[in-house]
């Protein structure tokens, strides 16, 4: 207690009383003392944070640590999931590989943490909690010894002063000696403690490089852990990729075409082949195919099924529009169009060429530059569209209509521009590219093609009303035979013709027209198709498509669809004098004043215009006449002619020309009056221009009361004279030429333009629109009529009068 009291008093004297204070440490050691405290703080905080980074339980054995490790728990979960899903699935295989990898990573993590704990965390703990506190403890002990020494010195000095004034020297001297010995002993203790403290401080300074190595070891251990982990990951990653690449069930929508073909090992994209094959089974005669929008839910479901490479053909055969919509969606969602961005400018430039032959040649050149994968798929698709166009009389999808609805899905610019421009100019240019390719599919892509390449889309055993698609009817089938299955198979979303038929039976044609509904006769399309072969046979050789550079020596395959059965293989002989002597009369009776329709009111030439001349390149000579027993009772193969009557709107006037000058449009050409509307304010390349002064006669007969044209007196009485027009119509470009055939190559081309102009009156306007108007047409027989016996003449007159009376009574009832 006395020693403690003396220390306190000495400390107070040094602090307040300005007593002498002995400093036993050098300046360097004082700096080391300050640094000790800073190092202690840093080491303590670092140790605390490193300990928090450890995921395992600190201080436990390796087995116990691994059970508490999150990576180990994750690995166990993945392995259990793999066992549940099974190794036969892609997801199960992925879970198994990842589970094994995570388990190995967990073991590496355990080794890493054990080494960090041993080489870094524990040394830092010793430094912060043991070594530096020991040095600081010695420093405090030295301070106490210094206070003891100073206190002894102070007391000895006071005793020495007081002994000099005292009379009795003996007791004072003995006390002074005792204090002096105490002072010397305290000084010795201070010296020893100071030396020890100095040694510890210098040792700490010398060991600073070892303390820095702790952090170097931390980085090295981490680097080694991550290297081993990376090695594990790099080893398992190729296995994972191999499993995924071996799994062929990958999405195809929105993926590049080359990637999809490479993964699936196919030449034709799966969605394209699947949709085309299904449409061949159940959609070739579907009206408005590719144009009628399908159900959104069905379309979404079918796209998802195609992504999974699983398609229920039987389910979707009832709705061909969903299949067509899926095909359009796949083409549009491709990152690059099927006709490529690289060739976009070349396609557009080719479409801008005015001359038909050069435009076709430019399109062919661009087509040959397509990459192999794109070329194979566009060839497959165009061949299908060409086959689909053979049924255009039923499905109403001409090459022009197909180009309108599919063109923007096959080619579009890489940079998105103004939406208005995209919908007008660019769309029309693309239509001008796709349409001739469809029309001349066999010229652009010669040879036959097998649509069901993989053989995995067989005809389903339909249990629904689509069973009649097992064999698709010919376009030339009788409309009455085709109408029943067509009406039965169509989905309710587009089955409107049945409703129109019921309206027609109950309320009559006038009431339907008063409702603003355009009524079309579905039987005329088959009759139009039956004369397609005769039209194609009259194409002059001067209008043949240019031969590709590689095929100039060989005859080109015909782009025409397969000829219909009833088309004559050779032109018929000329009409008899009685049939050929029909000439136009000076005057044309008004339709409103007579129930007899003039044969020139809707036809492109006189009744003998085709029979009276031979097609260029054909040989004139006697031809074997068809036996009457082989011909239908009401038609002659040489004398079928069309006289068109239009219900609404009024067709443009076509002038009467002399016989032997007009060759009809080839079968491969589309109807210029597109069923789909062209973009607004954009001139259509196939548009019709009406004369400004053209209007319907005020007294024209209604369609319901129009007389039949079976009476031969119509042709023996007055013939038509074309009506003058204020100004001639603009002449559009000629229809695309047809490829040459072997039988036509030997003859010289004959011009069909000058005789047509010669046969016109000065007031008449001439049109070279060799087109089909989308209006009902009625076949009129000339040859058979002119050769009728009087008995047959009278019988047909009676039938005609009966029909007239029936239609008049119906019109009166309406």
From Swiss-Prot:
Composition bias type Basic and acidic residues, residue spans: 479-489, 790-805
Principal subcellular localisation of the protein: other
InterPro entries: AH/BAR_dom_sf, BAR_dom, RHG17/44/SH3BP1-like, Rho_GTPase_activation_prot, RhoGAP_dom
Region (Interaction with BST2) residue spans: 727-814
Keywords: Cell projection, Coiled coil, Endosome, Exocytosis, GTPase activation, Phosphoprotein, Synapse
Modified residues (Phosphoserine): 493, 805
Organism name: Rattus norvegicus
SUPFAM superfamilies from the UniProt entry: BAR/IMD domain-like (SSF103657), GTPase activation domain, GAP (SSF48350)
Subcellular localization(s) per the UniProt record: Cell projection, Dendritic spine; Recycling endosome; Presynapse; Cell projection, Dendrite
Residue ranges of domain Rho-GAP in the record: 255-445
Pfam family, one: BAR
Residue ranges of the TM segments: none
Biased composition (Low complexity): 531-541, 567-581, 598-612, 622-637, 684-704, 741-752
A GO MF label: GTPase activator activity
Domain of life per record: Eukaryota
Tissue: Expressed in brain, detected at high levels in hippocampal CA1 (at protein level).
PANTHER family: 3BP-1 RELATED RHOGAP, RHO GTPASE-ACTIVATING PROTEIN 44
Function field: GTPase-activating protein (GAP) that stimulates the GTPase activity of Rho-type GTPases. Thereby, controls Rho-type GTPases cycling between their active GTP-bound and inactive GDP-bound states. Acts as a GAP at least for CDC42 and RAC1. In neurons, is involved in dendritic spine formation and synaptic plasticity in a specific RAC1-GAP activity. Limits the initiation of exploratory dendritic filopodia. Recruited to actin-patches that seed filopodia, binds specifically to plasma membrane sections that are deformed inward by acto-myosin mediated contractile forces.
Annotated site (Arginine finger): 291
Gene Ontology CC annotation, any one: presynaptic active zone
One Gene Ontology biological process: regulation of GTPase activity
Name of the protein this chain belongs to: Rho GTPase-activating protein 44
Positions occupied by motif PDZ-binding: 811-814
